[in-house]
């Protein structure tokens, strides 16, 4: 993700946004699995958040970041729209915030 964002000659901002979404998704799913919460196959971060709120009520504050990342599951994955440097930077920052919350909940170093 950071490699895509930091590339010098041809930054892959689309890839950075997509991978930020994927990273957040995998972290949320890890917390759900750890808590024994069953979920269906989905890439919808808001759906995953609603399930996680059963065990992590303070995570409601993550909704703005998850809303922003949610669109990257498909929006920039296919030709058409392109992410900007600012958008990629925001996506990486949002992902890092979510990562911190989940790692703390799992007792891992943040």
Model-assigned labels for residue ranges:
Residues 1-110:
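Terminal alpha-helical segments
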